[in-house]
Amino acid sequence: MGLLTGDTLGPLAVAVAIFLLLVDLMHRRRRWATRYPPGPTPVPMVGNLLQMDFQEPICYFSQLQGRFGNVFSLELAWTPVVVLNGLEAVREALVHRSEDTADRPPMPIYDHLGLGPESQGLFLARYGRAWREQRRFSLSTLRNFGLGRKSLEQWVTEEASCLCAAFAEQAGRPFGPGALLNKAVSNVISSLTYGRRFEYDDPRLLQLLELTQQALKQDSGFLREALNSIPVLLHIPGLASKVFSAQKAIITLTNEMIQEHRKTRDPTQPPRHLIDAFVDEIEKAKGNPKTSFNEENLCMVTSDLFIAGMVSTSITLTWALLLMILHPDVQRRVQQEIDEVIGREQLPEMGDQTRMPFTVAVIHEVQRFGDIVPLGVPHMTSRDTEVQGFLIPKGTTLITNLSSVLKDEKVWKKPFRFYPEHFLDAQGHFVKHEAFMPFSAGRRVCLGEPLARMELFLFFTCLLQRFSFSVPAGQPRPSDHGVFTFLKVPAPFQLCVEPR
């Protein structure tokens, strides 16, 4: 005879509901603390998940900022979140309290894909020994293989010439520039990680770029947040591997490429690229179970550097070309400065920047206006801290609304317009603003910032030295409103290229 009857089901349901409500209250008790940031009222069990606008989170956060101020709180299921808006709040958290806010929140979706505590890569790694070890290694290795040296500048310049040749083949017909930009930028980071470049029609490069685009789509939206906030759902067999199939495929493909390079490694010779250098560290660390130099992390660090090194720079260059066809007067001024300083025959060099204030200002304004990582990468407090007078307890996820800094009406004269004069003084000299932080700030500032700056200047000036860009005849003017996933990318558009 069954134990659950009509007479027992009702009381049991009530008991379960009361228990869950008590658990929910226990998780939310921090909201009652003095000086905890205000925020919208959460719904039991799911918090503010159902209220979030995952398609336009920047607009949603702007509305909440208007209601609650520059520091407000959310509850994503049982995950406490504090959103920081405006220069003062973001700078205080990331720079002045960087030791308290340098951690990353746990990401159960990645743990479920088989990544262990010593194999978290770089960008989502928890703040601690393993992260310090890998950041130190990556910075020193990138320097050893050319970052800050003439050799890397030559790699970028040579790749820019290949890119210009590919653009020249498109002359006379409309085309979308994103695919070619992805390939060119990928080859720069590939030279550092794999010691080689790919031909633009190489099947493996095309596969890697396609998987990267899929991964970016999978890595945003409601489902990702729901699975991270309610990780018990990840125990549904096969769910994580299916929902995040592109990430798994990238790991597999990266591992294949790593193994191919390891077969040609001569241990008696200096390392040829980052993979060789990492393998040397694995050999040195043998017998140490706590080291972050292991086979799994080799794959994670390599894929982290490749994806981050490619995506952000290529998207920024796509924004640059879009804004040039929308603002032909700015394009002409950049070309005039290139002609006066470099000429049309000599290749651009990084040393030219000091004599090209308008071009440098345009590149900075592209980054500000494009605002490609509007919400940054999430941080987490590693101990109780304060921001703008609010108490933020240990273990709170922090979202740094970088868009609110790059578009702050108190800082920028025309925050929602493309206006290179933001970075020029009255005499036409370049000036940099403290509110310019597209690479974030503090201890977790993007380690690839110097490389990105080099690529942006050299690719952009090479392209505008060789070509003029325009909206294709008969096509409507493209929109300069971006499309948000995890990143903010231009809506699909085409342009025409004309050799100068």
From Swiss-Prot:
Q: As annotated in Swiss-Prot or TrEMBL, what is the tissue specificity of this protein?
A: Liver. Also detected in several other tissues.
A single GO molecular function, which one? iron ion binding
Gene3D superfamilies in the cross-refs: Cytochrome P450
- The EC number(s) attached to this protein equal 1.14.14.1
CDD domains, sorted: CYP2D (cd20663)
- What does the record say about its membrane topology? Peripheral membrane protein
Q: What cofactors does the UniProt entry give for this protein?
A: heme
Q: Which Gene Ontology terms of cellular component type are present?
A: cytoplasm; endoplasmic reticulum membrane; intracellular membrane-bounded organelle
**Keyword Iron among UniProt keywords:** yes
- Residue sites binding heme per the record: 446
PROSITE patterns per UniProt: CYTOCHROME_P450 (PS00086)
- Enzyme group, top EC level? oxidoreductase
Location comes to: Endoplasmic reticulum membrane; Microsome membrane
Catalytically driven reaction(s): an organic molecule + reduced [NADPH--hemoprotein reductase] + O2 = an alcohol + oxidized [NADPH--hemoprotein reductase] + H2O + H(+)
* Pfam families, alphabetized: p450
Q: Which residues form a coiled coil?
A: none
Q: Which UniProt keywords apply?
A: Endoplasmic reticulum, Heme, Iron, Membrane, Metal-binding, Microsome, Monooxygenase, Oxidoreductase
InterPro entries given in the database record: Cyt_P450, Cyt_P450_CS, Cyt_P450_E_grp-I, Cyt_P450_E_grp-I_CYP2D-like, Cyt_P450_sf, Cytochrome_P450_fam2
A single GO BP annotation from the record? arachidonate metabolic process
PANTHER family associated with the record: CYTOCHROME P450 2D6-RELATED (PTHR24300:SF1), CYTOCHROME P450 508A4-RELATED (PTHR24300)
Q: What does the UniProt record say this protein does?
A: High activity for the hydroxylation of bunitrolol and imipramine; low activity on debrisoquine.
The protein's name is Cytochrome P450 2D15
Q: Which organism is it from?
A: Canis lupus familiaris
The gene name reads CYP2D15
